[in-house]
């Protein structure tokens, strides 16, 4: 399948089949001010970095994609499966500074226009949802905990229209080189999707898991047509020149920003 994320300055831009009012993308680590290492484009305020750096990077991205910072919404993610609907009243939340608002949220959606849903990632899976006929957009953060917690199915529970009208984009995340132990493997085997399709045993207490594939399987099992699910080939852990990787860089790294908005 042709890669739909096209590299631009500072971000990957998702290419739709038809003209659309939706903007969907994922930032890269290139050409910024942050020390991860020097000149990195970190987008997270919650790690050790200058607030000035983050604001500067936000301003750059805002100008590139046509969504001013006061239209952005950023929840505080906690690797859980809590979902919230956001509206125009949430615009600007946690953008200039972090607050207690939208804390513990790993999935959000809206039917309002002129809102940019944003979340930070550095190996976890960004899952974008949209339906042009229904004016709906959504974004979920699925690390191994969120994937095991089936956050994508929690997102689907909030959808009250036919899944034929729903499109899903699974963005850049770690490759199947992401290693888990027996305990985590056993957790995933509790799920009703076939674990042999996304987990590969490589040695004693060593298993590689394809989190992008697992989320696609969960969506298909829930009834989303496979033709409506796009999975990028980009892997954060395999492209350190382009992406931050929490696992590969042992936590000493920045964060990319996934975003989706509708004019």
Curated annotation (Swiss-Prot):
InterPro entries recorded: Cu_polyphenol_OxRdtase, Cu_polyphenol_OxRdtase_sf, Cytotoxic_necrot_fac-like_cat
Molecular function GO terms recorded: adenosine deaminase activity; copper ion binding; oxidoreductase activity; S-methyl-5-thioadenosine phosphorylase activity
Entry cofactors: Cu(2+); Zn(2+)
Residue numbers binding Zn(2+): 79, 124, 141
Gene3D superfamilies tied to this protein: CNF1/YfiH-like putative cysteine hydrolases (3.60.140.10)
Swiss-Prot/TrEMBL keywords: Copper, Hydrolase, Metal-binding, Oxidoreductase, Transferase, Zinc
Family: Belongs to the purine nucleoside phosphorylase YfiH/LACC1 family.
Protein name: Purine nucleoside phosphorylase SE_0862
Organism encoding this protein: Staphylococcus epidermidis (strain ATCC 12228 / FDA PCI 1200)
């Amino acid at each position: 399948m042709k890669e739909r994320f096209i590299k631009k300055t500072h971000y990957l831009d998702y290419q739709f089949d038809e003209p659309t009012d939706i903007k969907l993308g994922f930032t890269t680590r290139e050409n910024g001010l942050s020390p991860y290492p020097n000149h990195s484009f970190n987008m997270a305020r919650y790690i050790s970095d200058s607030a000035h750096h983050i604001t500067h990077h936000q301003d750059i991205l805002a100008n590139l994609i046509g969504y001013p910072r006061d239209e952005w919404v950023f929840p505080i993610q906690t690797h859980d499966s809590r979902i919230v609907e956001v509206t125009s009243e949430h615009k600007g939340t946690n953008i200039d500074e972090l607050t207690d608002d939208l804390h513990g949220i790993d999935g959000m959606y809206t039917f309002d226009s002129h809102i940019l849903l944003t979340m930070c990632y550095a190996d976890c899976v960004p899952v974008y949802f949209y339906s042009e006929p229904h004016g709906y957009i959504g974004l979920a953060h699925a690390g191994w905990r969120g994937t095991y917690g089936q956050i994508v199915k929690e997102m689907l529970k909030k959808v009250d229209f036919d899944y034929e009208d729903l499109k899903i984009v699974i963005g850049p995340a770690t490759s199947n080189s992401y290693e888990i132990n027996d305990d985590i493997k056993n957790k995933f085997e509790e799920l009703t999707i076939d674990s042999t399709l996304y987990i590969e045993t490589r040695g004693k207490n060593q298993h590689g898991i394809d989190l992008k594939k697992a989320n696609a399987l969960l969506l298909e099992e829930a009834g989303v047509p496979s033709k409506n699910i796009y999975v990028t080939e980009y892997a954060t852990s395999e492209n350190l020149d382009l992406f931050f990787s929490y696992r590969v860089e042992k936590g000493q790294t920045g964060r990319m920003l996934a975003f989706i908005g509708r004019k």
